[in-house]
Amino acid sequence: MEFRLPSLPVFLSFLLFFLMLVRHWKRSKGQGKPPPGPKPLPILGNLHQLADGLPHYAVTKLCRKYGPVMKLKLGQLDAVVVSSPEAAKEVLKTNEIKFAQRPEVYAVEIMSYDHSSIVFSPYGDYWREMRKISVLELLSNRRVTSFRSIREDEVWNLVQFISENEGCIINLSERIFTMTNDIISRAAFGNKCDDQHNFTALLEEILQIGAGFAIADLYPSLTFLRPLTGMKPALERIHKKMDKILEEIVTEHQIKRKAAAKNNTEFEEEDLVDTLLNYAEANKNEFHLTTDQVKAVTLDIFSAGSETSATSMEWAMSELLKNPRVMKKAQEEVRQACKGKSKIREADIQNLEYLKLVIKETFRLHAPGPFTPREARETCEIGGYTIPAKAKILINLHAMGRDPTIWKDPECFQPERFEGSSIDFKGNHFELIPFGGGRRICPGISFATANIELGLAQMMYHFDFKLPNGKSLEDLDMDENFGMTCRRKENLQVIATTRIPFEK
C-alpha cells in the first residue's frame, strides 16, 4: 500500500494543536489547581455579583455554591475566600508565615503613617517589635487590669445617664459608643481629650471607606482614579485633622516627661502613650520609634479598642431585646449574683457564665468585621488548591458563623449552644475567630472583652428595656452596615425602666 504524507494544512493544524496542549500542560503544572469560583467579566471581574445588597452576604451566598475555598476577581485583584474552619486553620496556623501579610488598603496607607500601625504594618522586623510591645506592654493582662477603675467609672456614667432618662427614648447605640470612646481615651491618652468628639467623627469616616472595597483598592494600578473619585482628598483632609489632634496629645506627654526629668522627679506611667514613649526612650539604641510611629500605634489602639467593644455591645443588646427569653435569663443571673448592691464592680461579675455565653453567641452571629484579610506572601496551597503569591485572602467569618454544617439552627440566637463546650473565641477554635488567629490575632481581646462584659452586666442588672413608640420586639430592625466593622444600619433606640436603683 502506498504511503502518503499528510497535507500541509492538516500537518500545521496538528502541530498547532500539539503546541497548545504543551502550553496548557506547562501552565497547569506551574499554577496547580486553582480554586473554583464564578466566571469573571472583563474589567469588573466578579464585582457585579457583589452589588446586590451587602458584600459579605453576597460573598457568603457564592461560597455556599462554590465551596469553602473560592476564587473571585475583584476588579484587578485576585481574591480567595475561605469559609470553613479547616481552610481557615490552614491560613492562620498551618501556613501562618505564608499568610502573615495584610493586603494593602489605600485608606490605611494614608492614615497609618505609611503602614506604621500594629494592625497594618507589613510582616517583618518592625511588625514583630510592635507586636511584642503590644502584647507585653500596651495590652497585657496586667495593663488591662490596671484600667479597671476607668472601665467602672465610664460604665457607671452610662448607667447614670440611663437612670436620669428613665421613660424617655434613649439612643443606646450613641451612648454605648460614647462610653467605649471615653474608656479608650482615658486609657490611651490619660484623659478625655478636648477634641474627642471631632476625633471619633473622623474615625467613623475612616471605618466606612477603609474596608478594602473602594475603587482605589480594587484597581490599584489606576492611580488617576484616586483624586477623581474624591477618595484621596477626603483621606488627606481626615488625616490632616487627625494628625493635628494626635500631635498635640503626644507633644503634651513629651513636655510632661521633660519637665519631670528637669526637676529630677520620677515620672509615673499613666497611659498607653506614656508606655510607648517610655519604651522608645529605653530602647532607643536598639529600636528607633519615631513620633509618627507613636501616633500610628495610638490611633490603632483607639480605633480597634473602641470600635470592637461598642459594635459587639450594640449587637448583644439588639439580640437580647429580640430574644426576651435570653434577656430574662441574663438579667436573673446578674441580679442574683449581685443581689443587694446599689452598684456593681468588675470583681462582682467574674462568674457570670451565662453572660459569657451571650457574648460568645454575639461574636458568632456578629463578628466585629465580616472578613479577616490576609495576603499570600508566596505561592502555596489551601484545601488542595493552589493560591498564587500576592492573592488577597478573605476569611469569611460571616459565612462560618451561619454555616448549618457547623451550627444547629445557625440563624437563631441561642447562647445555650456553648454550654459544656470548650469552644472559645481566642484563636484556638477556627469556627469562632472574631479576633482572627495566628501571629496576627488581635492583641486587644482581653481589653475588648472586659469592656463588653462590664457594660452588659451593668445594664442587665439595673434596667428593663423595651422598644419605643409601642413597637413589638418582632419589629426590631437588625439590618447591618458594611465597613471595616459591621454596625447596625439604624441606631438602637430603647426606653429603660429602673429595676435596681443606681447610686454612684
UniProtKB/Swiss-Prot annotation:
<dbReference type="GO" id="GO:0016705">
    <property type="term" value="F:oxidoreductase activity, acting on paired donors, with incorporation or reduction of molecular oxygen"/>
</dbReference>
<dbReference type="GO" id="GO:0020037">
    <property type="term" value="F:heme binding"/>
</dbReference>
<dbReference type="InterPro" id="IPR001128">
    <property type="entry name" value="Cyt_P450"/>
</dbReference>
<dbReference type="InterPro" id="IPR036396">
    <property type="entry name" value="Cyt_P450_sf"/>
</dbReference>
<keyword id="KW-0479">Metal-binding</keyword>
<dbReference type="InterPro" id="IPR017972">
    <property type="entry name" value="Cyt_P450_CS"/>
</dbReference>
<keyword id="KW-0408">Iron</keyword>
<keyword id="KW-0560">Oxidoreductase</keyword>
<comment type="similarity">
    <text>Belongs to the cytochrome P450 family.</text>
</comment>
<dbReference type="Pfam" id="PF00067">
    <property type="entry name" value="p450"/>
</dbReference>
<dbReference type="GO" id="GO:0004497">
    <property type="term" value="F:monooxygenase activity"/>
</dbReference>
<keyword id="KW-0503">Monooxygenase</keyword>
<protein>
    <recommendedName>
        <fullName>Melianol synthase CYP71BQ5</fullName>
        <ecNumber>1.14.14.-</ecNumber>
    </recommendedName>
</protein>
<dbReference type="GO" id="GO:0016020">
    <property type="term" value="C:membrane"/>
</dbReference>
<keyword id="KW-0349">Heme</keyword>
<comment type="function">
    <text>Monooxygenase involved in the biosynthesis of limonoids triterpene natural products such as azadirachtin, an antifeedant widely used as bioinsecticide, and possessing many medicinal applications including anti-tumoral, anti-malarial, anti-rheumatic, antibacterial, anti-inflammatory, anti-pyretic and diuretic effects. Catalyzes the conversion of dihydroniloticin to the protolimonoid melianol.</text>
</comment>
<dbReference type="GO" id="GO:0005506">
    <property type="term" value="F:iron ion binding"/>
</dbReference>
<feature type="transmembrane region" description="Helical">
    <location>
        <begin position="2"/>
        <end position="22"/>
    </location>
</feature>
<dbReference type="InterPro" id="IPR002401">
    <property type="entry name" value="Cyt_P450_E_grp-I"/>
</dbReference>
<feature type="binding site" description="axial binding residue">
    <location>
        <position position="442"/>
    </location>
    <ligand>
        <name>heme</name>
    </ligand>
</feature>
<comment type="pathway">
    <text>Secondary metabolite biosynthesis; terpenoid biosynthesis.</text>
</comment>
<keyword id="KW-0472">Membrane</keyword>
<keyword id="KW-1133">Transmembrane helix</keyword>
<keyword id="KW-0812">Transmembrane</keyword>
